[in-house]
């Protein structure tokens, strides 16, 4: 479709007539058809950025203690049965595991940014581990 020039139009002048509002008593008695208010929705990415700032400020552990403890005991079973753990030992393992994961995700994010993306993918995690010199499982 070809573009055409806009021509000037003559204005009809004046303002459009306003609708008359119903009297206050009549408005209150009328049933509200759209009375259900929609929940507020943030724009995509806003909540994610808020969460990032929140977790970067905080220092508390993010993995739940009992599931982590069960995982540690399950892995330890492969090496020796009937092992017992002090609670401080499990806490130290959890602190170290979270520090490792945070560092890995930082490096992974840098790899994704280098690829001109903001979404991390498994290939970035693999690249970050390879650059760090870590061996993959099964090698």
From Swiss-Prot:
Annotated positions of the N6-methyllysine modification: 5, 19, 24, 37
Annotated keywords: Acetylation, Chromosome, DNA-binding, Methylation, Nucleosome core, Nucleus, Phosphoprotein
Gene Ontology cellular-component terms listed: nucleosome; nucleus; plastid
Stretches with biased composition (Polar residues): 1-10
Native species: Arabidopsis thaliana (Mouse-ear cress)
Residues carrying N6,N6,N6-trimethyllysine: 5, 37
UniProt-listed InterPro entries: Histone-fold (IPR009072), Histone_H2A/H2B/H3 (IPR007125), Histone_H3/CENP-A (IPR000164)
GO MF entry, a single one: structural constituent of chromatin
Residues bearing the modification N6,N6-dimethyllysine: 5, 37
Modified residues (Phosphoserine): 11, 29
Annotated segments matching region Disordered: 1-43
Family label: Belongs to the histone H3 family.
Residue positions where Phosphothreonine is found in the record: 12
Subcellular location: Nucleus; Chromosome
Top-level taxon: Eukaryota
N6-acetyllysine modification, residue list: 15, 19, 24
Subunit annotation: The nucleosome is a histone octamer containing two molecules each of H2A, H2B, H3 and H4 assembled in one H3-H4 heterotetramer and two H2A-H2B heterodimers. The octamer wraps approximately 147 bp of DNA.
Protein name, per record: Histone H3-like 5
Function as written in the Swiss-Prot or TrEMBL entry: Core component of nucleosome. Nucleosomes wrap and compact DNA into chromatin, limiting DNA accessibility to the cellular machineries which require DNA as a template. Histones thereby play a central role in transcription regulation, DNA repair, DNA replication and chromosomal stability. DNA accessibility is regulated via a complex set of post-translational modifications of histones, also called histone code, and nucleosome remodeling.
Record-linked SUPFAM superfamilies: Histone-fold
């Amino acid at each position: 479709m070809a573009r055409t020039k806009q021509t000037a139009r003559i204005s009809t002048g004046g303002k459009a007539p306003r609708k008359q509002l119903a009297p206050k008593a009549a408005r209150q008695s009328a049933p509200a058809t759209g009375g259900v208010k929609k929940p507020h929705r943030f724009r995509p990415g806003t909540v994610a950025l808020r969460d990032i700032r929140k977790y970067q400020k905080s220092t508390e552990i993010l993995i739940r203690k009992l599931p982590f403890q069960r995982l540690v005991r399950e892995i330890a079973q492969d090496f020796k049965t009937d092992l017992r753990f002090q609670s401080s030992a499990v806490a130290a393992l959890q602190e170290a595991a979270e520090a490792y994961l945070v560092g890995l995700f930082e490096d992974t994010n840098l790899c994704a940014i280098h690829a001109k993306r903001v979404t991390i993918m498994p290939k970035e995690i693999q690249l970050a581990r390879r650059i760090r010199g870590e061996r993959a499982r099964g090698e």
